[in-house]
């Protein structure tokens, strides 16, 4: 939210800001005094659950960005940022990937400096996201698994295990829904939303694949363990363990996929969100 300050400082009385992440909601309300509401995204219904025809073991529908530098390069002194604050926040978050960038700023410099310093953290945050996405994908590839990815951005992925990356042409949202219907496992990596979910989570479930995602408070609180598989982004070996277990045990995979589908189709379609939005508007008007 700090990167869109002009939007939040000019909100009209009565306007509502919908946020996909609970932390963002709190930030906007506390810093800007706006009326922000936690409103997670949802997915597109793509048909009834069907486990037939799943020819793709693992898919990830998302963009790749090469990390600016790695934590090892930072620790060695080979690379760094322009300011002490940026370097200290980068060091704190890479030491504990469960932290949000906002949490690190407050812990190091206090809440009073949060709005000021968050404006300088865009590339710090982006580099952290890009690094952990790269690390997770590379760890899976290094274990011998192949991942189907989509779009030319993945041609920039460099690793000793790149041969296990299957790059397909770019696809749109409707095509992604059909890809999930052909997949056994769909991967999700959050863009450091520690209290939210993505549309991709819902789309994977609605496609009947097992969703494996790095954990957030929202996912832990709104899904059961038999509906989604969660791992710590700083421990990608957990991701490999989960993939290994699911691909070896069709009964387990089918059970989780079907349970996730049922949860998503009843609570996490865009139709569900439209109903919730209309109710929210009614409550605000009343």
Q: What is the role of each PLM region?
A:
Residues 5-17:
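A conserved, positively charged/aromatic
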Residues 30-194, 216-218:
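Nucleotide-sugar donor-binding catalytic core of glycosyltransferases
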């Amino acid at each position: 939210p700090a990167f869109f300050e002009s939007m939040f400082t000019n909100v009209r009385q009565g306007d509502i800001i919908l946020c996909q992440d609970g932390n963002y909601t709190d930030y906007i309300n506390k810093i800007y005094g706006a009326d922000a509401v936690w409103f997670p995204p949802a997915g597109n219904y793509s048909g009834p659950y069907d486990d037939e025809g799943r020819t793709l073991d693992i898919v990830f529908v998302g963009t790749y960005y090469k990390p600016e530098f790695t934590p090892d390069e930072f620790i060695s002194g080979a690379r760094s940022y322009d300011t002490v604050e940026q370097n200290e926040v980068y060091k704190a978050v890479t030491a504990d990937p469960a932290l949000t960038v906002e949490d690190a700023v407050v812990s190091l410099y206090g809440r009073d400096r949060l709005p000021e310093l968050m404006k300088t953290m865009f590339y710090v945050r982006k580099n952290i996201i890009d690094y952990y996405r790269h690390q997770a994908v590379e760890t899976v590839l290094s274990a011998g698994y192949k991942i189907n990815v989509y779009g030319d951005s993945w041609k920039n992925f460099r690793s000793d295990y790149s041969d296990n990356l299957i790059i397909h042409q770019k696809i749109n949202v409707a095509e992604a829904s059909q890809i999930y219907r052909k997949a056994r496992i769909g991967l999700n990596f959050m863009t450091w939303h520690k209290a939210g979910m993505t549309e991709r989570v819902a789309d994977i479930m609605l496609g009947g694949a097992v969703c494996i995602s790095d954990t957030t408070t929202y996912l832990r609180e709104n899904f059961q363990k038999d509906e989604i598989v969660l791992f710590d982004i700083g421990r990608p070996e957990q991701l490999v363990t989960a993939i290994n277990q699911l691909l070896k045990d069709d009964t387990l995979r089918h059970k989780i996929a079907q349970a996730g589908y049922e949860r998503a189709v009843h609570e996490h379609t865009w139709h569900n969100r439209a109903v919730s939005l209309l109710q929210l508007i009614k409550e605000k008007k009343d």
